[in-house]
Amino acid sequence: METPETRFCKESKVVKTSRVFPLDTNNHNTLFGGKLMSYIDDIASISAARHCRRETVTASMDSVDFLKPIGQKDSVCLESYVTWVGTSSMEVFVKVIKEHLMTGERELAATSFLTFVALDSNGKPVPVPRVVPETEEEIMLHNTAVQRANERKNRKRHSQALANALGTDKPW
């Protein structure tokens, strides 16, 4: 197996800005959490594909932390990039910033980490390029990624044990 090349975090960077419309909101007039999660998975998948230039699958939405509500008078700006890689897996970080469109005030509204796996034409995992951080933020996220990777492995073990204990009988 050939050793993959190296890419900078910025080469996988994607930015997406959307306006919050009434149909995107819940009974609190804030953006539906599920809608934001869909935006997060979408933008993160583009970062993963840009990094490895292959088909990818979402292996895990590792964390989504909702920090501030996003209202109808806000736009929502998502920024994503690959922060760390395993052999065939990639950790993608997504930062969500809300901007009040009347005042211009910007606040960090959410953060998320996702894991993607690169696939070959047969749907099998394939090695991905190494990733090199450059900015302070990228370096900090890269340096703390091994801890998150270990937490993912532990969580996956616990999830598998839970899945083995659950039944699949019809609930009705």
UniProtKB/Swiss-Prot annotation:
<dbReference type="GO" id="GO:0005737">
    <property type="term" value="C:cytoplasm"/>
</dbReference>
<feature type="domain" description="HotDog ACOT-type">
    <location>
        <begin position="10"/>
        <end position="122"/>
    </location>
</feature>
<dbReference type="GO" id="GO:0005829">
    <property type="term" value="C:cytosol"/>
</dbReference>
<dbReference type="GO" id="GO:0006637">
    <property type="term" value="P:acyl-CoA metabolic process"/>
</dbReference>
<keyword id="KW-0378">Hydrolase</keyword>
<feature type="region of interest" description="Disordered">
    <location>
        <begin position="148"/>
        <end position="172"/>
    </location>
</feature>
<dbReference type="InterPro" id="IPR029069">
    <property type="entry name" value="HotDog_dom_sf"/>
</dbReference>
<dbReference type="Pfam" id="PF03061">
    <property type="entry name" value="4HBT"/>
</dbReference>
<comment type="similarity">
    <text>Belongs to the acyl coenzyme A hydrolase family.</text>
</comment>
<dbReference type="GO" id="GO:0009062">
    <property type="term" value="P:fatty acid catabolic process"/>
</dbReference>
<protein>
    <recommendedName>
        <fullName>Uncharacterized acyl-CoA thioester hydrolase YkhA</fullName>
        <ecNumber>3.1.2.-</ecNumber>
    </recommendedName>
</protein>
<dbReference type="InterPro" id="IPR040170">
    <property type="entry name" value="Cytosol_ACT"/>
</dbReference>
<dbReference type="InterPro" id="IPR006683">
    <property type="entry name" value="Thioestr_dom"/>
</dbReference>
<dbReference type="GO" id="GO:0052816">
    <property type="term" value="F:long-chain fatty acyl-CoA hydrolase activity"/>
</dbReference>
<dbReference type="InterPro" id="IPR033120">
    <property type="entry name" value="HOTDOG_ACOT"/>
</dbReference>
